[in-house]
């Protein structure tokens, strides 16, 4: 039997899972690692710790499955996106901590570029992205400017840049492969997503030398092999994708209009838009989903800052619950929020608003309002923010959405999933396997290595746990949306 090893390198932990040819999980391993916050707005990882945690997980997963690396048909990689690493080619040693996707240290640089008028609508359409510290370009420029002698060495070809997938593959291959897939590259602000190639004008804008960039490879397909010294055998590296692209693939969103939402600390909603990127008029992100030879799939993406983090605030900020899982029972004590509306703009609002000055607010409180109403309003807010994204995508010409596939920790909350179906007016489908990021990495690699012929062969691997069907009338839906829109408008620009 063939086996596939999926490496799932996330923001707070590294995971590894072994899948068999029937798509069954044979083992799971996880290692947490350290996040550092050296200054306000800065978030860093130790690149060496990322490697140790990920490769230790891989070895643990193989041992737990009772397998040797030589029995693997392929390795697939899914990774936290945008996080930026700069290393020395000769030694493989990182020259500085990795700058994490959440890091905001380059906000002033982005503001300066906007003020100079060099960021145009044409560049936004070329990249599919907003000019924001979230993405890799200004992070890399910061490293080149602040690590001693880095810019000269980068221009001389002595240094390598990569997102976390590149960093992992470099060391997994013993330094023989400096690559990234088109989907990860699309999150750097340096890729023309239409040509799927590095763009000279963007490199010039951010002052990035081409010599530091990785080679672009398909998301699906063998790009090289692991060094036998790492896992004990040379194994084809056959699939690479950013975590949200991998989750979309793992959710089998293979046709245009299909979408998934990951309910984690934040929420990430991706909709397959087919072979053509959609130009958003609602400040959504257009990105490369995955590529295989001449075939390429694009996606429209919206990000919500406060998903499960809203529930964490109920626990840590208000003390309404002791564990996050208790929110469902508390919210279920009341039939609705009793007119209470929570706008969880604690760190501003993400798509489609992109309002950094918005702030969290509770509206509609009366003497009769209690903890259950606030808990219900928190779940409503997660569902309503997702509804905002879906309606923006529809207005951009994507879709229409017929069902929403869900994953992530909060997808286990039945009340939230029912509220989501009611709010969207379409079925919400929860699969049995909620670890869809690792599953997606395995599926990409399995197709790339020939374990599975194509996406049709993956059909048995995605199975439904439960379908939540909408119960609200359109009038109910409209009334809730109107009240939400009023509350959001009141919370905006609060800190401006």
From Swiss-Prot:
Pathway: Polyol metabolism; glycerol degradation via glycerol kinase pathway; sn-glycerol 3-phosphate from glycerol: step 1/1. Sn-glycerol 3-phosphate binds at residues 11, 81-82, 134, 243. It catalyses: glycerol + ATP = sn-glycerol 3-phosphate + ADP + H(+). Gene3D superfamilies: 3.30.420.40. ADP binds at residues 11, 15, 265, 308, 409, 413. Glycerol binds at residues 81-82, 134, 243-244. Signal peptide: none annotated. CDD domains: FGGY_EcGK_like (cd07786). It comes from the Bacteria. PANTHER family: GLYCEROL KINASE, SUGAR KINASE. Belongs to the FGGY kinase family. This is Glycerol kinase. The lineage of its organism: Bacteria, Pseudomonadati, Pseudomonadota, Betaproteobacteria, Rhodocyclales.
């Amino acid at each position: 039997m063939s086996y596939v090893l999926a490496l799932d390198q996330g923001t707070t932990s590294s995971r590894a899972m072994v899948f068999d040819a029937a798509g069954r999980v044979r083992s799971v391993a996880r290692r947490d690692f350290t996040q550092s916050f050296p200054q306000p707005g800065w978030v860093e990882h130790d690149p060496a710790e990322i490697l140790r945690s990920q490769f230790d997980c891989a070895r643990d997963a193989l041992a737990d499955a009772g397998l040797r690396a030589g029995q693997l048909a392929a390795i697939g990689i899914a990774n936290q996106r945008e996080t930026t690493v700069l290393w020395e080619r000769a030694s493989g040693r990182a020259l500085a901590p990795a700058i994490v996707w959440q890091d905001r240290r380059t906000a002033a640089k982005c503001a300066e570029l906007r003020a100079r008028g060099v960021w145009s609508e044409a560049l936004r359409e070329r990249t599919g992205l907003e000019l924001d510290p979230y993405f890799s370009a200004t992070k890399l420029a910061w490293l080149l400017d602040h690590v001693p002698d880095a810019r000269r060495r980068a221009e001389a070809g002595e240094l390598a840049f990569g997102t976390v997938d590149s960093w992992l593959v470099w060391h997994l291959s013993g330094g023989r492969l400096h690559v990234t897939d088109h989907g990860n590259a699309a999150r750097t602000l340096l890729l023309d997503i239409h040509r799927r190639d590095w763009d000279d004008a963007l490199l010039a804008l951010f002052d990035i030398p081409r010599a530091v960039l990785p080679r672009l490879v398909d998301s699906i397909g063998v790009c090289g092999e692991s060094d036998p010294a790492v896992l004990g055998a040379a194994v084809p590296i056959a699939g690479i994708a950013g975590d949200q692209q991998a989750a979309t693939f793992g959710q089998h969103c293979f046709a245009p209009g299909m979408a998934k939402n990951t309910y984690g600390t934040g929420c990430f909603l991706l909709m397959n838009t087919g072979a053509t990127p959609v130009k958003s008029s609602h400040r959504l992100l257009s990105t490369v989903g995955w590529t295989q030879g001449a075939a390429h799939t694009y996606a429209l993406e919206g990000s919500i800052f406060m998903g499960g983090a809203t529930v964490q605030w109920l626990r840590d900020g208000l003390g309404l619950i002791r564990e996050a899982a208790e929110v469902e029972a508390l919210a279920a004590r009341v039939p609705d929020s009793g007119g209470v509306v929570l706008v969880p703009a604690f760190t501003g609002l993400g798509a489609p608003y992109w309002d950094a000055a918005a702030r969290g607010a509770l509206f509609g409180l009366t003497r009769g309002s209690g903890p259950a109403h606030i808990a219900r309003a928190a779940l409503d807010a997660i569902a309503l923010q997702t509804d905002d994204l879906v309606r923006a995508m529809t207005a951009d010409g994507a879709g229409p959405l017929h069902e929403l596939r869900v994953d992530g920790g909060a997808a286990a909350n039945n009340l939230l999933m029912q509220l989501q179906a009611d709010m969207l007016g379409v079925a919400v489908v929860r699969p049995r396997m909620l670890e869809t990021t690792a599953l997606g990495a395995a599926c990409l690699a399995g197709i790339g290595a020939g374990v599975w012929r194509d996406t049709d062969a993956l059909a048995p691997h995605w199975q439904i746990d439960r379908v939540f069907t909408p119960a609200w009338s359109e009038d109910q839906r409209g009334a809730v949306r109107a009240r939400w829109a009023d509350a959001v408008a009141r919370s905006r620009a609060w800190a401006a």
